Amino acid sequence: MNLQVDHIRVDFIIGSRRISNFCWAFILLFGALGFFFVGFSSYLQKDLIPFLSAEQILFIPQGIVMCFYGIAGLFISFYLWCTICWNVGSGYNKFDKQKGIFSIFRWGFPGKNRRIFIQFLIKDIQSIRMEVQEGFLSRRVLYIKIKGQPDIPLSRIEEYFTLREMEDKAAELARFLKVSIEGI
């Protein structure tokens, strides 16, 4: 989602609260619980979950391994749920031509650096760079080139579904900032 007035443009960045993250967190949680309960059922020699039979599983070594996988999956699921709750990675890119400032704000993990806020001068922006790698793990990222700084990514890798969307976004931003586009 973008918000643009005459001299201010704000691009909102979606963080961890995406449907795919919710799906993976649920799948991981239920899968890990299934593994753990089957492993624990093999220890008790009693089915804790009616549709998951543990009669054929010996506690040593299969039951222990399943409990271990279940606990590991629960930790990973907990991590995913925490990133979703904290909305890590969300924020905005703000371009204020009146003040001449480009600001990046992102939410991070809790702690001293929870809020990430960086500012640059708009006059130092050289261009908008597009990086496109097609293939099995395609990658489409917009970068902003600033004098004396490494390229700064403006978008997530999976944000753009088509090359056309990415080109349109880059063209809008380049037009607003009156800079050139590099890449492709």
Swiss-Prot record:
GO terms for cellular component: chloroplast thylakoid membrane; photosystem I. PANTHER family: PHOTOSYSTEM I ASSEMBLY PROTEIN YCF4 (PTHR33288:SF4), PTHR33288. Belongs to the Ycf4 family. It comes from the Eukaryota. InterPro entries: PSI_Ycf4_assembly. Keywords: Chloroplast, Membrane, Photosynthesis, Plastid, Thylakoid, Transmembrane, Transmembrane helix. Its main location: plastid. The gene is ycf4. It holds the Pfam family Ycf4. GO terms for biological process: photosynthesis. This is Photosystem I assembly protein Ycf4. Seems to be required for the assembly of the photosystem I complex. It is found in: Plastid, Chloroplast thylakoid membrane. It is a multi-pass membrane protein. The chain crosses the membrane at residues 21-43, 58-80.
